[in-house]
Amino acid sequence: SLIVNKSSPKILKTSNLSHYQMIRQFVETLHRWGKATYIGFNSIDFDEEFLRSTLFKTLEYPYLTSTSGNTRGDLLGLARAANLYYPKTLKNPISEKGNAIYKLDQIAPLNGIEHGDAHSAIGDVVATVGIAKIIYKNASNVWKASQLTTDKNQTLEIIKKELYFCTNEYF
């Protein structure tokens, strides 16, 4: 992480905040921002789990991103669904087995998104926003449908009301 973000161990020693203080500032910032939809690339299975674990360890409420009017989504699943329903929404590299690859650092450049250092915080944000814009533009129905299912209760209402609905999972 230090290498990817071009930092040094020295910055860890000279930080003005403890881990707990940093997380407190983070939580206070989220509260100050108010209700939001949090979307990342592969964020549900990685970032959200890491965040919840960190919040729990610091005695903070671990479900900040999915309660009190906040919702969350994952652009990885959305990218896969967009290409399923609107083929060629995104350009993907192909694996040796002939499968589309959905790694952010590989699909971003193929789709004209120059995002600097892959896996750096700002680089991944730039790439994620770029991919989101492409999906919004080229597969707007998939984008709109995904926004209806970022909240558990709203999703349950859709399931109860609709005669048919579709969900996509990838393994």
Q: Which residues does each predicted region cover?
A:
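Metal-dependent phosphoesterase core characteristic of DEDDh/y 3'-5' exonuclease domains
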Residues: 1-9, 29-142, 146
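Metal-dependent phosphoesterase signature
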Residues: 4-23
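Short linear motifs at secondary-structure transitions and domain/linker junctions
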Residues: 13-16, 48-52, 161
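Generic hydrophobic alpha-helical segments
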Residues: 22-30
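Acidic two-metal-ion nuclease catalytic site recognized across multiple nuclease folds
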Residues: 133-171
